[in-house]
């Protein structure tokens, strides 16, 4: 009986010592255990805006019922040349990572045969597509053929960075040495609908004079159109993030 009682007390004492040791060392083992790391994504969060592509609306001037200006022999319509250069430029910009929306990709247009409604439909498309920029392609003209008027120029909307973009485009076009740089101008709101009534930052490129033989020869040359498109795309890439 004495032996059993002694064993009992020894067992009880051992149990109490075990509890005491656990209570002493457990906090240290908890503190020394590796803590779970926060996910990296908490620190490398990218906002939806940063993930979105920059959207550019490429507008080939005229089209369908509206041929635009014509060459002296009436064989070349402005609408055809602007479409060719606009499509080439858009394709290059898409390759660079921009989201491109076209006002037209052929000579079939969906808007009515009314100039004001036509231009407003192009503006509305830019708004609907949430475009960041609107770039309209055109050719210039005068009332008389080969009267000395030639060169490229751009009209921009004030109060945004379109002038900066246009300047970069002009620098690239000037390197082609195909005509005269006529400069960058703020839009005349009485006549340029796609700039005056456009909430999207917009510019209108006049790439040369269809009424000048030297300009026209370059504008109609397909290989030179590729060079021109590359120059325009390079100017945009230099100043507009994808």
Q: What residue ranges belong to the model's regions?
A:
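Catalytic-site microenvironment of enzymes
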Residues: 1-242
């Amino acid at each position: 009986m004495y032996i059993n009682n002694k064993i009992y007390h020894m067992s009880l004492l051992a149990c109490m010592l075990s509890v005491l040791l656990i209570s002493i060392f457990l906090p240290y083992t908890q503190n020394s255990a590796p803590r779970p790391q926060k996910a990296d994504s908490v620190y490398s969060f990218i906002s939806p805006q940063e993930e979105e592509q920059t959207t550019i609306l490429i507008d080939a001037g005229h089209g369908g019922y509206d041929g635009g200006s014509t060459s002296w022999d009436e064989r070349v319509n402005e609408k055809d040349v602007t479409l060719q250069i606009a499509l080439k430029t858009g394709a290059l910009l898409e390759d660079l990572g921009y989201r491109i929306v076209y006002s037209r990709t052929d000579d079939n247009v969906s808007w009515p045969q009314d100039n004001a409604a036509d231009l407003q439909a192009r503006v509305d498309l830019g708004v609907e597509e949430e475009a960041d920029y609107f770039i309209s392609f055109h050719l210039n003209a005068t009332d008389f053929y080969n009267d000395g008027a030639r060169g490229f120029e751009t009209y921009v909307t004030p109060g945004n960075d379109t002038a900066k973009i246009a300047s970069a485009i002009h620098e690239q076009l000037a390197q082609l040495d195909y005509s005269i740089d006529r400069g960058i101008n703020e839009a005349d709101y009485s006549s340029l609908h796609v700039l005056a009534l456009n909430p999207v930052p917009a510019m209108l490129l006049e790439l040369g004079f269809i009424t000048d033989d030297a300009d026209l020869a370059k504008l109609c040359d397909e290989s030179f159109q590729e060079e021109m498109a590359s120059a325009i795309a390079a100017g945009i890439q230099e100043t507009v993030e994808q």
